[in-house]
Design a protein with these regions (language model features):
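PAS-family sensory domain signal
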Residues: 2, 8-63
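Sensory coupling linkers of modular signal transduction proteins
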Residues: 3, 116-146
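Signal-transducing coiled-coil linker helix
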Residues: 12-14, 20, 139-143, 150
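Active-site-proximal structural segments of metal-dependent nucleotidyl cyclase/transferase enzymes
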Residues: 26, 147-155
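Hydrophobic pocket-lining residues within nucleotide cofactor-binding pockets
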Residues: 33, 112, 129
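PAS-family sensory domains
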Residues: 50-122, 151
Length: 155
């Protein structure tokens, strides 16, 4: 798989995260390797040990949110992605919630190269893999919270 080529500025990509985030339960992110900058959906700050929805010093800031036993795994992955030795990110590991408890996530993304073919961005989506299902696909019944929401919306 070959990396895509950037046709957007960092600002445009960050704006896209802000635009699409309210439409999703998952968390979109943009990591700019050259600027050492990271932007994630604003609602991620409410859930995880993140100081803000955007920051510089990507590795140092991830030390605050990644479960310590999983940090080396992520650091190796980021090195491979930022040097072009890997172009697709798909990693299961743990982040810390606001209470400091580990939360299993799946983080996927794709590397986007600059015009010289060097990795510039990693863009993708982070989702919680431990979330309870909202509905049972066998019975078709909604789960508790979803059922209550559905009933309130149909009064």
């Amino acid at each position: 798989m070959k990396a895509e080529v950037a046709h957007f500025t960092t600002e445009q990509m960050v704006d896209m995260v802000g635009l699409l985030s309210p439409c999703m339960d998952d968390y979109l992110y943009v990591c700019d390797f050259k600027e050492d900058y990271y932007q994630i959906s604003p609602n991620a700050v409410k859930r995880f040990c993140l100081p803000a929805d955007h920051f510089h010093n990507v590795v140092e800031m991830h030390r605050q949110v990644v479960y310590p036993d999983d940090l080396d795994l992520l650091l190796v992955e980021l090195e491979l992605l930022s040097t072009g030795r890997k172009v697709f990110h798909n990693l299961h590991y743990r982040w810390l919630d606001k209470m400091g408890m580990p939360v299993w996530i799946n983080c996927r993304g794709i590397v986007i190269d600059d015009s010289q073919g060097k990795p510039q961005y990693l863009v993708g989506c982070l989702n919680e893999t431990g979330n309870q299902r909202r509905a049972d696909n066998i019975t078709g019944l909604l789960g508790g919270i979803e059922f209550n929401t559905y009933m309130r919306s149909h009064k």
